Design a protein with these regions (language model features):
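Phosphate- and other anionic-substrate recognition elements at nucleic-acid/protein interfaces
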Residues: 1-157
Length: 157
């Protein structure tokens, strides 16, 4: 069983587990969008390639995709960018014909006894997945993607 966690967004990440154990994690692939407030966007072609290269046709695959919402004080451009990234991730998973489960940050964090503290989240992922590349503070999105993949593994199987 392959489980995948996707933290959408241009600073997000995608993580892969096999039977609950670490396989791979990487930052969300992005491409230059052009001028404007938001300069980058998630690259759908690259994301589909990553999803296919890290899965096998003969194994069941289940994806946990974080359901994102606008937060008070966010600008219109950043809200649109996040929604666009979510849609790109959702379409990429659908293109691969993988089963998908939406999950809110509150739900998967509660499962692991976490709060909104991103460093605690990263520390938890480092303990669970010591082989994963999570050593930098900026790897919190990788940590979250790994924990979502573990959440879907633990709650659906």
């Amino acid at each position: 069983m392959i489980t995948i966690g996707i933290d959408p967004g241009i600073y997000g990440a995608v993580a892969f587990l096999i039977d609950g154990k670490y396989k791979h994690v990487q930052d969300m692939p992005v491409m230059l969008k052009g001028s404007g407030t938001v300069k980058n966007e998630v690259n759908p072609t690259a994301l589909v390639t990553i999803l296919r290269e890290n899965t096998s046709a003969d194994e069941a695959v289940l994806v946990a995709l974080e359901r994102v919402n606008a937060m008070p004080g966010q600008g219109v451009s950043s809200v649109f960018s996040l929604g666009d990234s979510f849609g790109t991730a959702r379409a990429s998973v659908a293109a691969c014909r993988f089963e998908m489960q939406y999950v809110t940050p509150m739900k998967w964090k509660k499962h692991f006894g976490l709060t909104s503290d991103k460093e605690v989240c990263r520390a938890t992922a480092i303990k669970m997945f010591p082989d994963a590349e999570l050593h930098l503070k900026k790897h919190v999105d990788r940590a979250e993607a790994l924990l979502m993949a573990r959440w879907v593994y633990e709650t659906k199987f």
